[in-house]
Amino acid sequence: MNNKNLFKEMFFTLIPLILTNSLGILKYITNAFLVGNFLGGKAISVLSNTFPITLIFYAISIAFSTSISVLISKTFYNTENENNIINSKKIANNGYMFALITGIIVSFIIFIFDNLFLDILNTPNEILYDSRIFLLLFAVSFTPNFLQKNINESLRVLNKPNIPLIFVGINVILNNLLLYVLILNDFGIISIAIANIFSDILILLASYVYIRSHEVLKIDFSLFKIDRKIFKDISNIGLPIVFEQIIVSLIIFFETSISNLGGIICNSAFGIVGRWEEIFFVFSQSIQSLMIIYICRYYFTKDKTMIFRITINGIILSILPIVLFISIAFIFTDFACKIFLKNEDIISIAVKYFHIAGIAYCIMPIDMIFNGFIIGSAKTKFLFITNIIASISEIIIVVLLYKILNYDNMLALGCGIITYTLFTLLLNYIYYLKNVFTICKIEK
């Protein structure tokens, strides 16, 4: 395949990925808009306080869904193996079992340790009760959400990126309609959690109907049993991603705790910028997903010299998101923050913080390209090492600026986030170069 055709193929694969994630962004924006405008700053604070906790558990579902899809892709595209279809089906069905078992365990952990998690975050007493109820309801929606992610990621690597787009679109519409109705009926902040439960379950049922006719992903009860080797392979790829994401979540715990030191005003400002951080992350994740799809396809089919061309095309395709991030973080910052809340004191702090942390957000798409290479080539252990180094660096910078040099807590946080992103980008890039040169040497 020449580079022109490769770029065209990657471009048309990226479009449904971006559209899918854009619909997810729309869900975040409308959720925060409805909560902020109908329920106020206190409700936004509940979202920002529970976000680090929900992120940890969502990270588990993302990590294992990704590892399952990598294994399916690796097996399915290995046409030298005449049993590639049946082996892919075995992995898919074991993936469903893995998601179901893990989902139940995660829900149980949240039910038992919810108070401990909120104590670690220094959650203000004014929002403690609402935060706890929100977490308990989140636990109920986790398993169907995990199963749905599993199906979506597998469809993407099997060259069906449009189907997850449809599922996510319907989910967003259902979620926001339910949320609006629940808020109008005085359900308060728990409206988001309740809307998530019902919309996730309904979409999972729709997904089940679709995969019943799919060659690889349909549920086959003769294969619906634990295969220790497949579970081990899922764990070998997924666990380093889980640990990496747990480190990221713990850092967000740390960041949230620091923002809480400035009271609800600082925490609400942190929450507003946090909504945009989620949006930027989801856009960047589209680039990462694209890299995973193509690296999986070519890394395991011995056509490894394509990797460099895939990476260059990924960088070109990331230019538009970067320009968009720069516009929001540095040009239309005031407008972007006021979408969620009208309180001038909170907006003032949010804008200043956004101008600092925004530097890191603009680098994020490039960092995700190299992340995608590492995950797609199943070299996930390095992600764990990278994040340990970057996280320690961020903590050192924040403590140095806030505790020792007495800088403003939000300024310290922004500088810490920049430090973290620069370290992950540098280390991932070095690792990428090392592997590409090794691959090229082997090919010669």
At which residue positions do the language-model features occur?
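Juxtamembrane/transmembrane-helix interface segments of polytopic membrane transporters
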Residues: 24, 28, 32, 36, ...
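Short runs within selected transmembrane alpha-helices of multi-pass transporters and secretion channels
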Residues: 24, 65, 136-156, 164-175, ...
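ATP/adenylate-binding site constellation spanning eukaryotic-like Ser/Thr protein kinases
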Residues: 69, 114, 160, 170, ...
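Hydrophobic alpha-helix feature that most strongly marks membrane-spanning transmembrane helices
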Residues: 247, 251, 255, 264, ...
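Transmembrane helix-bundle signature of multi-pass secondary active exporters and lipid flippases
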Residues: 15-70, 138-145, 232-300, 318-325, ...
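Helix-loop interface residues and adjacent transmembrane-helix termini in multi-pass membrane transporters
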Residues: 38-41, 157-158, 186, 261-264, ...
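Small-residue-rich hydrophobic transmembrane alpha-helices
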Residues: 44-107, 148-157, 161-163, 267-327, ...
